[in-house]
């Protein structure tokens, strides 16, 4: 019937938009990974080169932020269920926020994104649509395999929370540092490492970002 076809069309459009946007981000992250490999190889770490690398990182960050806030059919593609305000914003220090919460403070428990106080991140709830697969209920809940997801929180792929990285700093000291899992935030840390001419830290951050890049690729495969 017509409603069924409309639902199917809506699902296809939303998945295509999410896949396309995530592919844009993956390309940008891959470019950064290649850029940083050049920066840490020892022949491109003079101040002029480092400044160029940092400027390129800033341009890439701007592109990632634009992709995160991309719109399709009046809906933020990666904003969860936020259709009214820009989902991904920056504070004065340049930290990335998702629907008002610093991405570094977000955790994921029992299918829910939580802030540092254990409250659900605003507008991050998943929504689903029935396209005739026989929606099955389990009490008040439904089997997600019998419906299609219609809202996506981009942090599922671009990263949230923090992890530890280990490296030997430029003074020869072993360092354990807590860093963001979000690719945007990692790029900001990379800019700091470039400014400090700390190539070991930069390399460790690049390895860390590669893990999140793999998560982005998995997301593209799931959406495709």
Walk through the language-model features, giving the residues of each.
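Polar, low-complexity export/assembly segments characteristic of proteins
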Residues: 65-222
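Amphipathic alpha-helical polymerization modules
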Residues: 1-83, 192-224
